[in-house]
Amino acid sequence: MPATTTNWKTIAAQHREKQRDAVPAEWLLPEKQLQGLKNTGDGNGSKLIESKAVQRSGLLTEKEIVITEKYTAAELLSKMHSQELSSEEVTVAFSKRASLAQQLTSCLTEIMFKEGIQRAKELDEQLKTTGKLAGPLHGLPISLKDSYRVKGHHATVGYVEFLRQPIPDHNSALVDLLLDAGAVLYCKTNLPQTMMTADSENNIFGRTLNPHNTSLTAGGSTGGEGALVAFRGSPLGVGSDIAGSIRIPSLCCGIYGFKPTSERVPFGGQSEYPFPKDHLPGIAPVGGPMANSIEDLELFMKITLAQRPWNYDPTVVDIPWRDLGEGDAKLTIGIMAEDPEYPLHPPVRRALAKAASALENAGHKLVYLPQDPKRNAGLGGRIGFQLFSIMGPDLDTVSREIGEPLVNSVAIAVHPFANGNFPVPPDLDTPTKLSRLNEVRFEYLKAWQETYRDNKLDVILAPGAVTTAIPHDTYGVPIYTLMWNVLDFPAGIIPFGKSSKFEDSEHVKAKAPFDPDYIPEATDGAPTAIQIIAPRYRDEECLRAMRIVDKTIRNSRAEKL
């Protein structure tokens, strides 16, 4: 794959210069001012959100701060469609804020501010002269994970080698759908090499930092979106998820994220390596939204499915969105048992307990599910990782083919079950191994289907991960998200509370591979979160339950963690 005419470092540096040149000069802050914004006093990373870095920067006007902080995406659409706000001023506001996010957290890849603002002007003119909207997303700025192809822009997915290849001359299926719905695309966001680690770093764009605490990971693989949305540099972001890549950055960055059932949101036409994931048997990757409210997750899903996505991507099933209304029904919620091989860090365990208490006090029925080896998280993780071992090449092959070194989070990700702890003997031929593994996967699915059925569950309440955001390159194995990809169940993250070095000091480290260390001082103040899961193709029920749960825990004293 790699050419040898130009050193990869030179190519990467040249592209970073092009990226910087795409930002208006007046939006670039002097290095001394940037260092001042990063210096928040305690020596444990920069608390960019808590220290109000945006306000201190002076880059945005008061109106632009209101536009980017006060409104949901749904509210912005309402104001633009009534012409109370113009798409141009909304797009400029989010572009300026995204440019600051980039300077402080390295969350962006392809910068499309100029094109986005021009499209916003055209949409404003269309609405003014004809009175007609371009579509239900008319004028709304939307950010995209780098893997989504946008015509005329690179989709490197973090590989320098991809900069040597022709710039895409076509859009991914979802990009076409969003444009037809009237969206404004203004930036793409960072991810890791391989898109298979929980840290977002590569040799082109560097490492994305968490705006809550820059010494902690922003998560991965959609970490750029997580950081940008948390920084309020985007009203609505689009990521992808095959093992937790939407949900892990969401919980790390304190935002909402949703992984739909596969084949409901168009995924075709993305840039991918080493896994051509949308064509191989195994775990299906999915696209999904990331935002600062559940309302905006629902907005994305409703509008996407209303656009008849099966006409954009032949793999999408023809299932229109079902509107379940705004009711506050009482739920029956299964409380997932903690896998003893992967014990939760104290802040995660406390957030789950507080959420469960609030839900029970509000009259929801809780069913505490006992530990069962037929359906525990570790088994789901082992199934998932063995499927990945079949789907793609080993890391040595990846490094050789891309012609550049692996970043640390990828290099240290030696297969967590390489010692043979697989559900199926790894030395079988591939067809036999895949057949046997699918049998194990079916039994795992059956165990969970029976759990929902026998307990009459609406949803499951579970952790999103063993930990909160933790120091870079230490995340561990994402079994509490990967298991739901193995099952292809819709799942969403709700931010809830914060870690506390005073309340969360006790932890016994597990013996499981890649169990991350818990360091109370390092993660103090990091966002905590819970995960809600529904059965396959019950995406509408999952989001409805997320809305009910979110409202319940916000209205309770439990939020004061």
Question: What are the residue ranges of the model-derived segments?
Answer:
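N-terminal, positively charged, Ser/Thr/Ala/Gly-biased leader segments
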Residues: 84, 101-163
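Acidic-enriched catalytic cores of C-N bond-cleaving enzymes acting on peptides and small amides
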Residues: 2-59, 280, 287, 292-319, ...
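Short, surface-exposed loop/helix-turn segments at secondary-structure junctions
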Residues: 383, 464-482, 501-516
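Structural helix-boundary/capping segments
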Residues: 100, 176, 180, 230-336, ...
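Short helix-loop capping/hinge segments that flank enzyme active sites or metal/cofactor-binding pockets
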Residues: 54-60, 64, 138-160, 325-336, ...
